[in-house]
A protein has these predicted regions:
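Short Lys/Arg-enriched helix C-cap and helix-to-coil transition segments
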Residues: 89-110
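Short, charged/polar micro-motifs that form catalytic or ligand-binding hotspots
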Residues: 39-43, 57, 68
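DNA major-groove recognition helix of helix-turn-helix
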Residues: 57, 82-83, 89
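General nucleic-acid-binding
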Residues: 1-23
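Short, Lys/Arg-enriched anionic-surface-contact patches
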Residues: 21-49, 73
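Short, amphipathic alpha-helical "recognition" segments used to contact nucleic acids or chromatin
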Residues: 46-62
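Short alpha-helical "recognition helix" segments of helix-turn-helix
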Residues: 65-70, 74
């Protein structure tokens, strides 16, 4: 039963993040693209991936292990991605804009 709810949460967050990323970058991002590629992935996909993992970890309390299983990444890579988003949300305009729009769409607040 827990997997069912986690899957619903993953689908909702990933689709909202992709929509918000498209809004600011004008490039289509699809949820199935978020976890493809290991190196040299395009910026818009990297931003969407990091922000979605950050929200799933910090707002929904999902463990790094759960996130790594979903994303086919190592636990360490997921940790780095979450930390990167946590820092860039406060320092990078693109991350800020996408994050703030996503939070307002998901939770109705800024």
């Amino acid at each position: 039963m827990e997997d069912y709810f986690y899957n619903k949460i993953f689908i909702r967050v990933e689709s909202v993040i992709c929509m918000c990323t498209k809004h600011f970058t004008k490039i289509d991002v699809h949820p199935q693209e978020l976890y493809y590629g290991i190196t040299k992935i395009p910026t818009h996909i990297s931003v969407a991936r990091c922000i979605s993992l950050n929200i799933l970890h910090n707002y929904y309390g999902m463990s790094y292990k759960t996130l790594s299983d979903r994303s086919n990444m190592t636990d360490k890579s997921v940790m780095k991605c979450v930390a990167k988003a946590r820092e860039y949300i406060h320092t990078d305009k693109l991350y800020q804009d996408i994050y703030n729009l996503a939070i307002s769409k998901l939770y109705g607040k800024s």
